[in-house]
Amino acid sequence: MRTALALVVVVVTALMLSGPREIPSDASQQEPLPKIAPAPQFTLTSQDGKPIALADLRGKVVAVTFIFTLCNATCPVLTPMMSLVQDRLGRDFGTDVAFVSITIDPERDTPETLKLYAQMYGADVPGWHFLTGEVPIIHDLARRYGVFAAKSADGDIDHSFLTSIVDRHGIIRVQYLGVRFDPEEFRRDILSLLRER
């Protein structure tokens, strides 16, 4: 009986001394995201007709995705979702976080067309860059980011969706396949990278 009582006292004391164990619930306590690879560099033309390079955004967390304005299937899902995340990021967006949407249809997506597209989805333009460029450069860049794109016989473009999050040092840290990923997880991953130095 004394042995059992002593054992209970030891266990209770150990539990009390160890304190409550907290389960991580936010981005500040989650495991660091893996380092996938250096992000492919680019210099393209923005919706304002100005050159923008990935290197210009060094020091920010950058989400890079590929879209085109005439897409009527999946791009209209991805861009509004990113707009929602833009709003949820609040004051971090633009100062510490940037979005880059690169057209895979540069023949039709001129800077003026991209500007209208950005306005249609409520993009916060100082922090969200819609980019176009020469066809071979865009196609090579898409391939290096892991995005497949090909023009179909009817002139439409079939393409895969892969959104990459690049850290402040230009390293891809996470990639989302498709367009139906959780916007809150996307936001948390961005916040996690913001907390890194």
List where the protein language model places each region.
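Sec-dependent N-terminal signal peptides
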Residues: 2-13
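Bacterial Sec-dependent signal peptides at the C-terminal "C-region" and cleavage site
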Residues: 11-27
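N-terminal "domain-start" segment that seeds a small globular fold
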Residues: 23-55, 80
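Short loop/turn microsegments at loop-to-beta-strand junctions
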Residues: 39-40, 62, 160-162
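Short active-site neighborhood of thiol/selenol oxidoreductases, capturing the structured segment around
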Residues: 54-82
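Structural microenvironment flanking redox-active thiols in thiol-disulfide oxidoreductases
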Residues: 79-141
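Structural micro-motif
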Residues: 128, 139, 143-152, 156-164
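Thiol-/selenol-based redox modules, centered on thioredoxin-like
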Residues: 152-197
